[in-house]
Amino acid sequence: MKITDLLKPQSILLNADPVTKADAIYTLGELMDKGGHLTDKAEYLKAVFAREESGSTGLGDGIATPHAKSVGVKEAALAAMVVPNGVDFEALDGQPSRLFFMIAAPEGAADTHVEVLSKLATM
């Protein structure tokens, strides 16, 4: 699995301007949907928000990786977004997140999201 196989040009947004964490998640969900990776955007976003309730995916150093497994996902995929002004994503270091990678995996897809996180970490 390669990052370039998971990330389509239509799922990338530079100079985004979400104001809140929820805005950022909705914007990334829209990018994921534009890439053709979702069968049910609302179901996927519900899973992402549920995942965020268990703990923020704001990693620190300006990076966030919101993700979820969901029946609303057709295939494993990525969406990417740059937010120059940053968004408070409740990161461990308290700094705003500026670089976002949203990870989508189909429900029951073993550890696909973990594999994608691992690949992102080595970039």
What are these regions (language model features)?
Residues 1-123:
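Cytosolic covalent-transfer regions centered on His/Cys nucleophiles
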